[in-house]
């Protein structure tokens, strides 16, 4: 699976920890911020563009609180994103909402929780069915 990641200065340490996990577990990792982006807007826009251009890719944006990257991602047409700080939400946003990007705040979750969030997000798959109506509504909005 192809996973696109990126971070601003506040999310860099957590991003690098998750990157190591992804590489160790044979994910294809595209790091859009080998060096920290000056602002979460830059890193999140880079992630969203890549995810849109590469069907089937998933993205993870890291910043201080997750909210900034979330706001940016949801402004991009074709992107469904969720700010998550727990494992269940990470899983369900893929399964029911077909989210292609999650945002994680490094000042909100620690490294162990972040790792579990990423695992759940990447293990989940979209159910479709009755949830497609919601996804279609979201895609019409942005």
Curated annotation (Swiss-Prot):
Q: What is the main EC category here?
A: isomerase
Which stretches are transmembrane?
none
Q: Which InterPro entries match?
A: LacA (IPR004783), RpiB_LacA_LacB (IPR003500), RpiB_LacA_LacB_sf (IPR036569)
GO MF annotations for this entry? galactose-6-phosphate isomerase activity; ribose-5-phosphate isomerase activity
- One GO BP annotation here? lactose catabolic process via tagatose-6-phosphate
Q: For this protein, what is the EC number?
A: 5.3.1.26
Q: Which NCBIfam families match?
A: lacA, PRK08621.1, rpiB_lacA_lacB
**Any idea what this protein is called?**
Galactose-6-phosphate isomerase subunit LacA
Q: Tell me which species this is from.
A: Clostridium perfringens (strain 13 / Type A)
Upper lineage is: Bacteria, Bacillati, Bacillota, Clostridia, Eubacteriales
Q: Which gene encodes it?
A: lacA
């Amino acid at each position: 699976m192809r996973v696109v990641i990126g971070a601003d200065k506040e999310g860099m340490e957590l991003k690098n920890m998750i990157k190591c996990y992804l590489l160790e577990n044979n994910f294809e990792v595209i790091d859009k911020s080998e060096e920290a982006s000056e602002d979460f807007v830059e890193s999140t826009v880079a992630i969203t563009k890549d995810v849109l251009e590469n069907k089937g890719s998933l993205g993870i944006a890291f910043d201080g609180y997750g909210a900034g990257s979330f706001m940016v991602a949801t402004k991009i047409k074709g992107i469904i994103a969720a700010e998550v700080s727990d494992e269940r939400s990470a899983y369900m946003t893929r399964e029911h909402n077909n989210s292609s990007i999650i945002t994680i705040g490094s000042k909100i979750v620690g490294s162990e929780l972040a790792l579990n969030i990423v695992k759940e997000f990447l293990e989940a798959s979209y159910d479709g069915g009755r949830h497609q109506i919601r996804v279609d509504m979201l895609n019409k909005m942005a």
